[in-house]
């Protein structure tokens, strides 16, 4: 049978299912380790610090490399990069489950981060190329279900699989899903940019980005232990500022930059990406609230997780609703509505001073609003970012957008945890949780303002 040409090919459900399955290898499977930290500590006979490195390094490496890989997808082929990403996930999963050596666990998790960096921008670019109009919005809705929905379910999923089958089955199932995704994507004609010349990859930009982000991550997670007046803290801060400044200068001069700052001349794209960074940052809410109810109210892990059931359900339901609102109201109104609803939910969850029964009620309602808001926001935001990117740079644009997702989540969790720990030590855990949750509410409010100012009422989308 003759393989369909790119010009004749239209995206179908088979390809879309393959794309969604490839996306959940990160957002559902790789992220589910957040709920099995203690089990990993025993299985690998190592300390909690090593396990925490293994858990966090996947999102960090995904965020650091996703932009560069987005550019490679534009140049060398988006189907090719998606397949490479899926194969990397299989390799990383195998390294994690074949032994009890902590080093292999960390290497496997690192490879899974690179896998996610390949899959996320490449699959968004495939949707941009092969799905048009309402079909594209529908495809983005399912892509969002894989990412936002996967991240919402991952904690329960990881705990359930680890309890019923053993934690290694998380990655055995991930390998099976990866093989199915490869089969479903097979036969799709390649899509790449025709106008981008194959210039030398921006190694300098990548190195500077890695140095900057690693320095910032250490400052946030270890800053209170190091002390703001310590030589190491000051050195890391200087490295972060210096590498960031040099990165900006070199990227503006580069002929083939890692991050094309010209994309940010489009206000709609800038608004979608910046708000996406901040709303992924409010993932710190889950860490702070779950820790608080366990330590402050004496809840078990299962009881704490049950409070957020309304979030998991609503985010999955409302993503398709967000798609319909996008089609009827445009991008801006659903993004504002979603963010506004999320702010209400965040404020309810932050009421840690209430009596236990009242707080539990506020949490359940708050998580409902939290999931409802994120679900409404997800598809319009993704559509705004992708629709406002030039076709020849959609891989880079998608890479930057998903870098904002990964880094927003990574730094949001780190910053929320740091604020919670510092304020709790200075006062008590009730105040510590409230202030940390207010930080998340502040990020959501800033996201609302950015959408209000930057995203136009009617986007001049490039369908």
Swiss-Prot record:
GO terms for cellular component: plasma membrane. The chain crosses the membrane at residues 19-39, 53-73, 86-106, 107-127, 142-162, 165-185, 201-221, 230-250, 273-293, 299-319, 334-354, 357-377, 403-423, 435-455. SUPFAM superfamilies: MFS general substrate transporter. GO terms for biological process: response to antibiotic. Pfam families: MFS_1. Keywords: Antibiotic resistance, Cell membrane, Membrane, Transmembrane, Transmembrane helix, Transport. It is a multi-pass membrane protein. One of its GO terms (molecular function) is transmembrane transporter activity. It is found in: Cell membrane. It comes from the Bacteria. The keyword Membrane applies. Belongs to the major facilitator superfamily. TCR/Tet family. Multidrug efflux pump that acts independently of NorA and is one of the factors that confers resistance against diverse quinolones and chemical compounds. This is Quinolone resistance protein NorB. It comes from Staphylococcus aureus (strain bovine RF122 / ET3-1). The lineage of its organism: Bacteria, Bacillati, Bacillota, Bacilli, Bacillales.
């Amino acid at each position: 049978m003759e393989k369909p040409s790119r010009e004749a090919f239209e995206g179908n459900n088979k390809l879309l299912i393959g794309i969604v399955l490839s996306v959940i290898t990160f957002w559902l499977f790789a992220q589910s380790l957040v709920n099995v930290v203690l089990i990993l500590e025993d299985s690998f006979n190592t300390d909690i610090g090593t396990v925490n490195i293994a858990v966090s390094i996947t999102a960090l490496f995904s965020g650091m490399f996703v932009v560069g890989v987005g550019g490679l997808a534009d140049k060398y082929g988006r189907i090719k990069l998606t397949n490479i990403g899926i194969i990397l996930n299989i390799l990383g999963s195998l390294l994690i489950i074949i032994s009890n050596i902590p080093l292999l666990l960390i290497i496997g998790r690192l490879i899974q981060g690179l896998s996610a960096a390949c899959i996320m921008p490449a699959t968004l670019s495939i949707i941009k190329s092969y799905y048009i109009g309402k079909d594209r919005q529908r495809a983005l809705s399912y892509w969002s279900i894989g990412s936002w929905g996967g991240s919402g379910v991952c904690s329960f999923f990881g705990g359930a699989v680890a309890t019923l089958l053993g934690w290694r089955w998380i990655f055995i199932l991930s390998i099976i899903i990866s093989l199915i995704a490869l089969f479903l994507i097979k036969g799709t004609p390649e899509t790449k940019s025709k106008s981008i010349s194959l210039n030398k990859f921006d190694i300098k930009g990548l190195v500077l980005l890695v140095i900057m982000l690693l320095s910032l991550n250490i400052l946030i997670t270890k800053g209170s232990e190091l002390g703001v007046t310590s030589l190491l803290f000051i050195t890391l801060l200087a490295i972060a500022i210096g590498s960031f400044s040099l990165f900006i200068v070199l990227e503006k001069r580069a002929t083939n930059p890692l991050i094309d700052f010209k994309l940010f001349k489009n206000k709609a794209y800038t608004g979608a990406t910046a708000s996406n960074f901040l709303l992924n940052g409010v993932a710190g809410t889950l860490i702070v609230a779950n820790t608080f109810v366990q330590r402050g109210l004496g809840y078990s892990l299962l009881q704490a997780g049950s409070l957020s059931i309304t979030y998991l359900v609503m985010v999955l339901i409302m993503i398709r609703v967000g798609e319909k609102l996008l089609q009827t109201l445009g991008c801006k109104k659903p993004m504002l509505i979603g963010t506004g609803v999320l702010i209400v939910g965040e404020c309810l969850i932050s009421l840690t001073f209430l009596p236990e029964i009242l707080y539990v009620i506020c949490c359940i309602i708050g998580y409902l609003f939290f999931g409802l808001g994120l679900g409404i926001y997800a598809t319009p935001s993704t559509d705004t970012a992708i629709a406002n990117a030039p076709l020849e740079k959609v891989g880079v644009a998608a890479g930057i957008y998903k870098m904002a997702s990964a880094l927003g989540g990574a730094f949001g969790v780190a910053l929320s945890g740091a604020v919670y720990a510092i304020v709790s030590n200075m006062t008590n855990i009730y105040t510590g949780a409230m202030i940390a949750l207010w930080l998340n509410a502040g990020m959501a409010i800033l996201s609302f303002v950015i959408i209000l100012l930057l995203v136009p009422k009617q986007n001049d989308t490039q369908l």
